[in-house]
A protein has these predicted regions:
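Bacterial Sec-dependent N-terminal signal peptides
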Residues: 1-22
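Mature catalytic domains of secreted/periplasmic carbohydrate-active enzymes
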Residues: 20-501
Length: 501
């Protein structure tokens, strides 16, 4: 009965709402002015580092990657073969039948937040809804939610409450713009080879559950009309999360360009007005140019900027070399590489979001925990060179060239290896931090060449290595600032603290 009421309300709702947009006026400048919105919150400028996770029904197979829900329906894909061997033919055992298998029986929000805080994160997030149509909160919009099915727990509620108890900001990420089946079996002459690859997550096939007319299955697989989707589902879920969980950041994955502008505007207006009422600074992350910069912030994926940006920006990395969700064969990245990514991002006026990949039962594997704790150990010593800093006049120097581009070159970014001669700079007050992306040889004289342009302006008082009690011998020359490298422990980046008057 409860599911029937969900569906009845959903399909009666959109008809009365469509007409409201006929005379709807959109003024993106006005919307930010009226809400007195700052798209670059000071707390986020100071925070620098957040941790979030991809975790949901797609974690159950622990195979391939988080697009398993889509690829399991494609007969030419390895995911289809795997699903057929382990669960049954997707025609009979669809993604909907995986939902009860996501039990999260060992999920402990406090343990997760404790871990993220020990790792040095200043905000925490979660994928609120991926492309798969399953909401990770107690939803009245869709029956496909974890409070009603699977774990029967309000995951976002438990997690966000713990974040707030720990004094951490809350981020929710939304990927549900792709849920709507936009083309089904129609022709797309403008994209003859790829029309069904990306714009809709679940492939429409008359042989598969994705084409079912069952009211429940239609909701999960996005087999609904645009009128049934944009207002009551896409926008409705966002409003529900804002009302019930009060996130500080809302992140959108790609494909916002597929959402009609009036719905983007209504979301933005709702979120910013809600923040104003609550007297809180919030942020909206978006990829590409799907929202104006006066109301949003750019986020990159597995890539970074070449130079210092005047506006605050963000990028997301994952703890593995490939999948965002847990898989049995996932290969993990080294903590020292992720520390260097964080340093590089911060030196260019950026913020890093690091993704972790819990198992479907709610355990974050020990190998991932060790990486996080290594990052936290480094930040415990060197955090003053990261948190609350701002870019110097130049981001850094050194022999290593960075790939050009965004996600299309993410594999090249992954291969990037820095040396001890690669340096990144941050600043706070009258202090400049020179961070080497490796450990230089003890006793070596190292020259920070970027200081040669600052000889007349800077009056250096002391140079030291953070974590060491000894002062470092230094000399300001026409080549730059020369320092003698002391003996240091560990294999991670070291920070020279240069105190000026």
């Amino acid at each position: 009965m409860k599911n029937a009421l969900f569906i009845l309300c959903l399909f009666l709702f959109p008809l009365e709402m469509v007409a409201q947009f006929e005379n709807y006026k959109m003024d993106w400048t006005k919307i930010s002015n009226e809400s007195q919105y700052n798209s670059e919150p000071e707390w986020l400028k100071d925070a620098k580092f957040g941790i979030y996770f991809h975790w949901g029904v797609y974690s159950v197979p622990a195979y391939s990657y988080e697009w398993y829900p889509r690829l399991m329906f494609m007969e030419n894909r390895k995911e289809y073969k795997y699903h057929k061997e382990h669960y049954g033919d997707p025609r009979e055992f669809g993604y909907d039948k995986l939902v009860p298998l996501f039990r999260a029986e060992r999920f402990n929000a406090k343990e997760w937040v404790d871990l993220f805080q020990r790792a040095g994160a200043k905000f925490g997030g979660q994928v609120a809804e991926h492309h798969d149509g399953v909401a990770m909160w107690d939803s009245k919009i869709t029956p496909w939610n974890v409070a009603l099915m699977g774990p029967k727990r309000d995951v976002l509620g438990e997690y966000s409450r713990e974040l707030k108890k720990h004094g951490m900001k809350v981020m929710t990420t939304f990927h549900h713009a792709r849920l709507l089946q936009r083309y089904k079996n129609t022709e797309r002459p403008d994209r003859p080879e790829f029309w069904d690859l990306y714009d809709s997550h679940f492939p429409y096939s008359e042989e598969m559950p994705t084409s079912s007319n069952n009211p429940m299955l239609r909701l999960l697989y996005g087999n609904v009309t645009p009128e049934e989707f944009y207002e009551p589902i896409w926008l409705g879920e966002l409003k529900e999360v804002i009302d019930n969980y009060s996130p500080d950041i809302i992140y959108f994955d790609s494909w916002l360009n597929l959402i009609p502008e009036e719905y983007l505007y209504k979301f933005t207006q709702y979120f910013l007005e809600d923040a104003k009422k609550k007297n809180k600074e919030v942020a909206i992350f978006r990829k590409q140019e799907d929202l104006p910069l006066n109301v949003s912030m750019e986020i990159l994926e597995k890539s970074r900027k070449q130079e210092i940006e005047s506006r605050l920006w963000t990028t997301e990395e994952t703890i593995s070399t490939d999948s965002w969700c847990f898989t049995e064969d996932m290969e993990l990245r080294k903590s020292e590489d992720l520390i260097n990514v964080l340093i590089d991002v911060v030196s260019k006026n950026g913020v890093l979001m690091l993704n972790v990949s819990p198992r479907s039962d709610g355990i974050i594997p020990q190998e991932q925990q060790s990486i996080l704790l290594n990052i936290g150990d480094w930040l415990k010593i060197n955090g003053e060179a990261i948190y609350g800093t701002r870019p110097w006049y130049v981001f850094g120097e050194g022999p290593t060239s960075q790939p050009v581009g965004d996600f299309e070159n993410h594999k090249e970014f992954m291969k990037l290896k820095y040396t001890a001669d690669d340096v990144r700079y941050t600043t706070k007050g009258k202090t400049v931090y020179a961070i080497t992306l490796g450990v230089p040889e003890a006793g070596k004289t190292m020259t920070f060449k970027s200081f040669k342009k600052k000889i007349k302006a800077l009056k250096i008082e002391n140079v030291s290595v953070i974590g060491s009690n000894q002062l470092v011998p230094w000399e300001l020359t026409k080549e730059g600032l020369q320092v003698k490298v002391p003996i240091v422990q560990g294999n991670n980046a070291i920070v020279f603290k240069i105190e000026c008057n």
